[in-house]
């Protein structure tokens, strides 16, 4: 495989993209920094096909990334291969308003092949290629220039091994009849709505004990305000106001801006500064949370009650058994919210009642809930037995 020098000019990038656009699939990875910012700071993009690989420097002055981004989001003829690509997809979405398609995520594929729920890239490379990666450069400050050869080689290794692993995984998925199992997951992670930062939904990420409509309404207004402040200033949310402080203000709202000086987690300057004024305006604009927006009393167990919670526990035990028996990560088979919904009596719009998930788990899950299936221990091994 030909490894190119770091690409820093538009002509070289356009030529590279034109060549790899003829490949049926490419491997993609990014390096970024976001410890001190709201938006991830893209520092490096690595791309490889079966014949060549390169790292692209998006910070190079005058570099036009359009050929690369067009290849990612507009070329449907090239499959894009990522490993644990959620943050890579977020970055591409932020730049283009689109997500790569079609795509393949090797971490999700590994779940279907019994390699655990969140296998790291190093372990994946070791498992499939028998190569132990040098991890010496993983804590690099990717925003700092210049990058040395060791750092660039480390970054390119993320795609040169990935491009070798993909066809092996694909062959194994086909051999085991599990290739189609991943289609729904790949469509799910490529859905652009996953990467939209909607201020009006930000409150759902803040932990708060209260379930009162007026308190949650204040939290919704405050979290939306904080989200917009963080986006505008490009600062982490916690640098604006920490979650616990936001929840405290929603639960015990100050009457005046001067009262902000008494709030734990805010400095005395909030009594008089502009950001304190904006917080108070957001607080004044709130409305009680609408009934349809109200969270369940226990968000982990929606409307289950004690018996329903026990049924959900039994379903999760069944899930462990099926995961063990078919050697597929439990997380790929069923999500906790689907299991809780099934335990609560829901029978529609559940992924576990469709396709391969129904065949491998959902049918037995319904039978367990409806009394046609029970647990049994035979020769020290937990199994399922039919009751009728």
UniProtKB/Swiss-Prot annotation:
All copies of domain 3'-5' exonuclease, residue ranges: 7-173
Location within or outside the cell: Cytoplasm
Domain HRDC as annotated: residue spans: 212-293
Family matches, as PROSITE patterns: HRDC
A GO cellular component annotation in the UniProt record: cytoplasm
Superkingdom as given in the UniProt entry: Bacteria
Keyword Metal-binding: no
GO biological-process terms attached to the record: tRNA 3'-end processing
InterPro entries linked: 3'-5'_exonuclease_dom, HRDC-like_sf, HRDC_dom, HRDC_dom_sf, RNase_D, RNase_D-like, RNaseH-like_sf, RNaseH_sf
Keywords assigned: Cytoplasm, Exonuclease, Hydrolase, Nuclease, tRNA processing
Membrane-crossing segments per the record: none
Keyword Heme found: no
Chain's role: Exonuclease involved in the 3' processing of various precursor tRNAs. Initiates hydrolysis at the 3'-terminus of an RNA molecule and releases 5'-mononucleotides.
NCBIfam families per record: rnd
Family assignment from sequence similarity: Belongs to the RNase D family.
Protein name listed in UniProt: Ribonuclease D
Record organism: Sphingobium indicum (strain DSM 16413 / CCM 7287 / MTCC 6362 / UT26 / NBRC 101211 / UT26S)
Gene name as annotated: rnd
């Amino acid at each position: 495989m030909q490894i190119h020098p770091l690409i820093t000019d538009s002509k070289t990038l356009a030529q590279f993209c034109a060549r790899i656009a003829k490949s049926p699939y490419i491997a993609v990875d990014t390096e970024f920094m976001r410890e001190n910012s709201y938006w991830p700071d893209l520092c490096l993009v690595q791309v490889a096909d079966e014949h060549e690989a390169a790292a692209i420097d998006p910070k190079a002055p005058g570099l036009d990334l359009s050929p690369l981004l067009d290849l990612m989001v507009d070329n449907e003829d090239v499959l894009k291969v990522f490993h644990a690509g959620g943050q890579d997809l977020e970055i591409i979405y932020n730049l283009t308003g689109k997500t790569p398609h079609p795509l393949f995520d090797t971490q999700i594929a590994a779940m279907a092949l019994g390699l655990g729920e969140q296998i790291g890239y190093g372990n994946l490379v070791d498992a499939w290629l028998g190569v132990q990666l040098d991890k010496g450069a993983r804590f690099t400050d990717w925003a700092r220039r210049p990058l040395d050869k060791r750092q660039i080689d480390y970054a390119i290794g993320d795609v040169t091994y990935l491009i070798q692993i993909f066809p092996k995984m694909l062959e194994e998925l086909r051999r085991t009849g599990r290739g189609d199992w991943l289609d729904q997951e790949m469509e799910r992670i490529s859905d652009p709505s996953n990467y939209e930062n909607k201020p009006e939904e930000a409150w759902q990420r803040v932990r708060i004990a209260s379930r009162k409509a007026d308190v949650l309404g204040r939290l919704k207004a405050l979290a939306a305000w904080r989200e917009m402040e963080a986006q505008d200033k490009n600062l982490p949310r916690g640098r604006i106001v920490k979650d616990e402080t936001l929840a405290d203000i929603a639960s015990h709202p100050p009457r005046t801006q001067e009262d902000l000086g008494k709030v734990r987690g805010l400095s005395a300057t909030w009594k008089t500064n502009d950001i304190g004024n904006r917080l108070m305006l957001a607080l004044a604009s709130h409305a009680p949370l609408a009934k349809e927006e109200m969270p369940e009393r226990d968000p982990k167990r929606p409307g289950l009650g004690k018996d329903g919670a026990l049924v959900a526990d039994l379903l999760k035990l069944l899930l462990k058994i099926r995961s063990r028996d078919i050697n597929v990560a439990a997380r790929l088979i069923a999500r906790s919210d689907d299991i809780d919904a099934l335990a609560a009596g829901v029978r529609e719009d559940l992924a576990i009642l469709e396709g391969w998930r129904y065949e491998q788990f959902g049918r037995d899950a319904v039978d367990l809930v409806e009394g046609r299936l029970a647990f049994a221990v035979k020769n020290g091994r937990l199994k399922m037995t039919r009751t009728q």
